[in-house]
C-alpha cells in the first residue's frame, strides 16, 4: 500500500525504507520483511530487512551526530522536540491507519495513541529543560575534617547512543517515551521497532525528520530479529538500552554488558477485591483493565483475586458487562479486535484448553475465528492451572476465589512478575497495607492498573523489569553525573 503526500518519500514501490543519516534508504540486502494484518491474516506492508553492515554504519553515524548534539543548547533541543510533537499530531490520521492495519488497534484508540505521544514529547521537552538546566554545588567543609578548599560542580551529561526497542502494542507511544528523553538529554537514538507496528513507527520517525533534527541523530532500522536483534543489543557502539516487551529482555540483559538498562518485561497484574468493595466500580474496572485492546497490554488486569463472600455477585456483574462488549474489526472501533498474530491466538487457546481440562468454570462459550477471540471470563480458576500464572496477552481473564487477604497477597507475590496490581476496598488503611505487601512496581487503589499519565514513575520488579520509566525517570536514566572540582589555594568562606 503506497503512502501519499508528504509521507511518500519513505516508501519504495511497496516496501517501506529504513531511516539513517537523515535519509530514507533501501537495504543493500535486497530483502524485505512482510507485516501481516491481524484481521485479514494477509500481508499488509513490507519493510526493509537491514543487514548487520548497515547497522554498523548507523552506529557510526549515531556516535558522530551525538557529539555535536550534546553541544546543542537545551532550549534548541526542546524547540525541535516541540516541533516534532506538533507534526506528529498533524499526521495522526495516517499513523493511526497503520496502527489499525498492523496491530488491529481500534481506530479511536489508534488516534489517541498518536495524540498522547505528541503530548509526551512536548512534556518531555519542558521537563528536560528544567531537570538538565539545574546542577549541584558542594563545598568540602560540609564533611568532617575538611576546610573549604574545594568547590564541587555536578551536572548531568548524556550517555551517548541509546538503543530503543518498543513493543508491538504501543509502537508509537512506547517509542517516543524512549526517543524524547534520549534526545532532550543530548543522546542520539537508534530505534528498532517491532515488526508488527514497524510502519507506524517509521511514519512517526518521519515526523522527527520533518522537524529538522540533525542527520544521523535519529535512526530507525527494520529487519528480522534473527539477523540484527542480538547484533544490535550486543553492539559495542550502544551506550544504553531501553526495551519494552517480553522475556526477550531477560536474554538482552545477560548479553548487553556494562551499560545502563531500562527494561519493562510484562506482568501478571493482580486485582484484589475485598468484601467491602464497590462491586459496580470493580466490575467496570475489570472490563476496562482486562479487556481494553483485547487484553494486549502489559498493565491489563491478568487475574482477579476476589473474596469468596462477594465472588458470585462480582462475577455476575462482570458477565453482564462482557456480554455488551462488541467484537469485530478494528476499523469498526470494536471493543474486542483480533490479537496480533496466529501464534498469539494459539498460545491463548492453549491456556484456555488447559483451564477447561482442569475444571475452570466458563462464564461464556469459548469462541475463536482466526486471530479473533471472543472475551472470556474464567471462574473458579485454581493455582494448578496455567492461566493462574501465565500472561495470556488476550481477552481471557481468570477469577480466583480467596478466603483471606493474605491468600490474595501470597498468590500475587508468588508470581515471577511484579509490574502492577490493584486493590478495591473502601478502607484506605487496608488498601495501603495491601499495597505495601504486594511485590509490584505500582499498586492502584480502586482503579485498574494503568501506565500513565506518562510523567508518573512506571517500573516493574522481579522478572517485570529493571529501572524505572516515566518522563523524569527516563531523562535521568539516560544521563550520567559529571563532577568538576575546583581546588582553592587556601580556605575560602563567605564574608570571611
From Swiss-Prot:
GO cellular component annotations of the record: cytoplasm
Reaction(s) the record says it catalyses: D-glyceraldehyde 3-phosphate + NADP(+) + H2O = (2R)-3-phosphoglycerate + NADPH + 2 H(+)
Record's keyword annotation contains Oxidoreductase: yes
Binding-site residues for substrate, renumbered to this chain: 116, 169-170, 297-299, 451
Domain of life per record: Eukaryota
PANTHER family: ALDEHYDE DEHYDROGENASE
Protein name in UniProt: NADP-dependent glyceraldehyde-3-phosphate dehydrogenase
PROSITE patterns (UniProt xref): ALDEHYDE_DEHYDR_CYS, ALDEHYDE_DEHYDR_GLU
Active site: 264 (proton acceptor), 298 (nucleophile)
EC number: 1.2.1.9
GO molecular function, one term: glyceraldehyde-3-phosphate dehydrogenase (NADP+) (non-phosphorylating) activity
Positions with a binding annotation for NAD(+): 245-249
Pfam family, one: Aldedh
Record keywords: Cytoplasm, NADP, Oxidoreductase
Subcellular location: Cytoplasm
Annotated family: Belongs to the aldehyde dehydrogenase family.
Residues where NADP(+) binds: 192, 195, 230, 391
Residue numbers marked as site, Transition state stabilizer: 169
Gene expressing this chain: GAPN
Protein's job: Important as a means of generating NADPH for biosynthetic reactions.
Main location class: cytoplasm
Amino acid at each position: 500500500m503506497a503512502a501519499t503526500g508528504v509521507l511518500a518519500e519513505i516508501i519504495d514501490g511497496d516496501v517501506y525504507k529504513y531511516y539513517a543519516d537523515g535519509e530514507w534508504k533501501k537495504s543493500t540486502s535486497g530483502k524485505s520483511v512482510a507485516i501481516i494484518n491481524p484481521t485479514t491474516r494477509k500481508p499488509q506492508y513490507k519493510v526493509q530487512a537491514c543487514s548487520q553492515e548497515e547497522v554498523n554504519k548507523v552506529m557510526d553515524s549515531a556516535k558522530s551526530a551525538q557529539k555535536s548534539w550534546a553541544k546543542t543548547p537545551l532550549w534548541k533541543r526542546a524547540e525541535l522536540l516541540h516541533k516534532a510533537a506538533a507534526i506528529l499530531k498533524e499526521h495522526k490520521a495516517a499513523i493511526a491507519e497503520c496502527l489499525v492495519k498492523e496491530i488491529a488497534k481500534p481506530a479511536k484508540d489508534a488516534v489517541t495513541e498518536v495524540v498522547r505521544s505528541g503530548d509526551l514529547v512536548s512534556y518531555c521537552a519542558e521537563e528536560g529543560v528544567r531537570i538538565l538546566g539545574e546542577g549541584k554545588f558542594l563545598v568540602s567543609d560540609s564533611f568532617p575534617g575538611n576546610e573549604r578548599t574545594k568547590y564541587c560542580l555536578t551536572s548531568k551529561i548524556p550517555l551517548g547512543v541509546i538503543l530503543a526497542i518498543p513493543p508491538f502494542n504501543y509502537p508509537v507511544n512506547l517509542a517516543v517515551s524512549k526517543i524524547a528523553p534520549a534526545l532532550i538529554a543530548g543522546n542520539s537514538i537508534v530505534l528498532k521497532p517491532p515488526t508488527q507496528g514497524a510502519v507506524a513507527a517509521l511514519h512517526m520517525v518521519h515526523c522527527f525528520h520533518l522537524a529538522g533534527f540533525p542527520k544521523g541523530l535519529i535512526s530507525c532500522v527494520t529487519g528480522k530479529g534473527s539477523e540484527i536483534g542480538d547484533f544490535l543489543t550486543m553492539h559495542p557502539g550502544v551506550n544504553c538500552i531501553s526495551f519494552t516487551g517480553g522475556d526477550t529482555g531477560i536474554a538482552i540483559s545477560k548479553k548487553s554488558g556494562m551499560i545502563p538498562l531500562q527494561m519493562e518485561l510484562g506482568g501478571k497484574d493482580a486485582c484484589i477485591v475485598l468484601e467491602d468493595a464497590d462491586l459496580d466500580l470493580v466490575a467496570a474496572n475489570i472490563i476496562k483493565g482486562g479487556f481494553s485492546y483485547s487484553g494486549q497490554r502489559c498493565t491489563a488486569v491478568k487475574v482477579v483475586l476476589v473474596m469468596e463472600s462477594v465472588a458470585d455477585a462480582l462475577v455476575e456483574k462482570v458477565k453482564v458487562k462482557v456480554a455488551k462488549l462488541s467484537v469485530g474489526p478494528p476499523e469498526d472501533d470494536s471493543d474486542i479486535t483480533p490479537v496480533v498474530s496466529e501464534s498469539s491466538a494459539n498460545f491463548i487457546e492453549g491456556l484456555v484448553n488447559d483451564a477447561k481440562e482442569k475444571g475452570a468454570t466458563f462464564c461464556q462459550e469459548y469462541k475463536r475465528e482466526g486471530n479473533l477471540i471472543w472475551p472470556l471470563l474464567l471462574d473458579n480458576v485454581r493455582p494448578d492451572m496455567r492461566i493462574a500464572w501465565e500472561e495470556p496477552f488476550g481477552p481471557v481473564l481468570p477469577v480466583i476465589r480467596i478466603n483471606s487477604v493474605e491468600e490474595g497477597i501470597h498468590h500475587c507475590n508468588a508470581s515471577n512478575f511484579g509490574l502492577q496490581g490493584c486493590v478495591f476496598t473502601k478502607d484506605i488503611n487496608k488498601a495501603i497495607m495491601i499495597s505495601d505487601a504486594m511485590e509490584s512496581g505500582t499498586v492502584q487503589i480502586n482503579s485498574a492498573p494503568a501506565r500513565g499519565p506518562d510523567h508518573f514513575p512506571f517500573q516493574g520488579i522481579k522478572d517485570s523489569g529493571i529501572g524505572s520509566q516515566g518522563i523524569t525517570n527516563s531523562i535521568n536514566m539516560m544521563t550520567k553525573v559529571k563532577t568538576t572540582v575546583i581546588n582553592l589555594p587556601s580556605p575560602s568562606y563567605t564574608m570571611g
